[in-house]
């Protein structure tokens, strides 16, 4: 008898059944390890995880699922709609039936139709390259240890820096953290009620950072996975205090935080430049404009004057625009001028937003202006 197959949004799917299914596919037992524990922000009942998913069922039984979660990102004065892909799951006995492919294409079509600006995920480059995703979100990663600290901080006065874990959603420190978070030049929207759950994603811990003399100094998510300071000049004091407790550390710094990149580069043992995620862009002109503006704000007087016209054969349609810098001020505008560079979709993602782009190396302006500081903090990943 032919099976009844459904492919579409997960409306009407039982949440407990859904969680059991994705936990099973990922090898979680659902108790000690599972999606509800890893990402309560997404899988609590009030978050409606099934409605944010695409599923395949055979005779009513789940065989495949992917989650698509919408977030708002503030980039300088621009707001972008960023859709994250998560829990891509296919039952072991339902593989090779094209279910993942069908759901991914369905999700991408809906993201484009709904006005998403870009999408991010974690996963293998070639696996998700079939669906237009490419390595992006370049960061500098630094390793710092006690030996570095002993040499670099020996003449620095000691300070009473403390890390206090925050576990109560009503902790008054959270209000300070939210306000500080929203002062950053690049941040994902985190409402007050969900802030703790968001920061504790992936079983990380949230810490308030305090100075014995001055009080609230910032907050840390995980083991330096995210560090937000009220005063960036406190970076060395915070690193020193962290190393005293932990011995060594790794810290990833997005490209917009130039002061921290500079400070970390002076005391680190090793540094690495790499991509932190996979992205696909649906509105290249808009997203390039937002992040080029952010770069000009955080690295003033560093953009050389020039103009470059690009034609992108994007998954959401062709886009042709001119990127120009005049007296250090960037603009990105639609144009019908003949393009200087023609790019396929994934080439364009790497060209503007990736750590490595062979096409970018062929153009002096592109090599000088890009990559742009696109980034999503780990706590905001899905």
Segments predicted by a language model, with ranges:
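Conserved acetyl-CoA pyrophosphate-binding loop and the N-cap/start of the following alpha-helix
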Residues: 94-106, 116, 234-241
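Conserved acetyl-CoA binding element of GNAT-fold acetyltransferases
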Residues: 79-92, 221-233
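C-terminal interaction segments
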Residues: 334-382
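Conserved GNAT acetyl-CoA-binding A-motif
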Residues: 104, 108-123, 246-257
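Conserved active-site alpha-helix within GNAT-family acetyltransferase domains
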Residues: 116-117, 123-142, 258-275
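GNAT/GCN5-related N-acetyltransferase fold signature
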Residues: 56, 68, 90, 209, ...
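Amide-forming acyltransferase catalytic core, primarily the GNAT-like/NAT-type
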Residues: 139-250, 255-260, 286-306
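Short amphipathic alpha-helix that is part of the acyltransferase structural core
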Residues: 1-70, 77-80, 84, 150-192, ...
């Amino acid at each position: 008898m032919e099976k009844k197959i459904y492919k579409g949004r997960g409306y009407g799917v039982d949440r407990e059944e859904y969680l059991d299914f994705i936990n099973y596919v990922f090898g979680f037992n659902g108790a000690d390890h599972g999606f509800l524990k890893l990402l309560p922000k997404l899988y609590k009942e009030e978050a409606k995880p099934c409605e944010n998913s695409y599923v395949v069922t055979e005779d009513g039984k789940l065989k495949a699922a992917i989650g698509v979660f919408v977030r708002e990102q503030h980039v300088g004065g621009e707001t972008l709609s960023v859709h994250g892909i998560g829990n891509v799951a296919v039952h072991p006995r339902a593989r090779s039936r094209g279910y993942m492919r069908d759901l991914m294409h369905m999700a991408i079509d809906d993201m484009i139709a709904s006005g998403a600006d870009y999408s991010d995920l974690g996963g293998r480059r070639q696996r998700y390259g079939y669906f237009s995703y490419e390595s992006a979100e370049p960061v500098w990663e630094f390793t710092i240890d006690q030996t570095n600290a002993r040499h670099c901080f020996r003449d620095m006065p000691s300070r009473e820096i403390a890390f206090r874990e925050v576990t109560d959603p009503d902790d008054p420190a959270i209000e300070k953290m939210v306000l500080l978070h929203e002062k950053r030049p690049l941040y994902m929207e985190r409402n007050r009620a969900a802030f703790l759950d968001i920061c504790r994603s992936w079983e990380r811990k949230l810490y308030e950072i305090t100075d014995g003399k001055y009080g609230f100094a910032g907050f840390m998510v995980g083991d330096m996975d995210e560090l937000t300071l009220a005063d960036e000049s406190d970076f060395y004091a915070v690193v020193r205090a962290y190393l005293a407790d932990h011995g060594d550390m790794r810290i990833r710094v997005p490209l917009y935080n130039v002061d921290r990149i500079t400070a970390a580069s002076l005391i680190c043992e090793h540094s690495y430049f790499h991509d932190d995620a996979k992205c696909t862009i649906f509105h290249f002109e808009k997203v390039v404009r937002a992040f080029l503006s952010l770069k000009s704000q955080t690295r003033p007087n560093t953009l050389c004057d020039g103009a470059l016209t690009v034609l992108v054969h994007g998954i959401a349609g062709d886009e042709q625009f001119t990127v120009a810098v005049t007296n250090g001020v960037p603009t990105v505008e639609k144009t019908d001028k003949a393009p200087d560079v023609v790019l396929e979709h994934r080439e364009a993602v790497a060209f503007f937003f990736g750590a490595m782009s062979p096409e970018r190396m062929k153009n002096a302006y592109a090599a000088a202006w890009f990559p742009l500081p696109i980034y999503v903090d780990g706590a905001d990943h899905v």
